[in-house]
Amino acid sequence: MAVPKKKTSKSRRNMRRSHLALGKVNVIVDSQTGEYKLPHHVSLVDGTYNNRQVVTKRIETEEAVA
């Protein structure tokens, strides 16, 4: 079984982990609804993309829910 020959210092450990940081999520404000959304994605509120309706909302009835 492989065992380290010397103890890894805090500096070397932290330098190795320097690339593991999470990046910021890029969000924009939708021009039609004013809600936050991811760029180049369909708006979850009204189903539009690039000012075009691409997803229609499904109307739920009592029969479909039951």
UniProtKB/Swiss-Prot annotation:
The keyword Calcium does not apply. PANTHER family: 50S RIBOSOMAL PROTEIN L32, LARGE RIBOSOMAL SUBUNIT PROTEIN BL32. The keyword Ribonucleoprotein applies. Belongs to the bacterial ribosomal protein bL32 family. The gene is rpmF. One of its GO terms (biological process) is translation. GO terms for molecular function: structural constituent of ribosome. This is Large ribosomal subunit protein bL32. GO terms for cellular component: large ribosomal subunit. Transmembrane segments: none annotated. It holds the Pfam family Ribosomal_L32p.
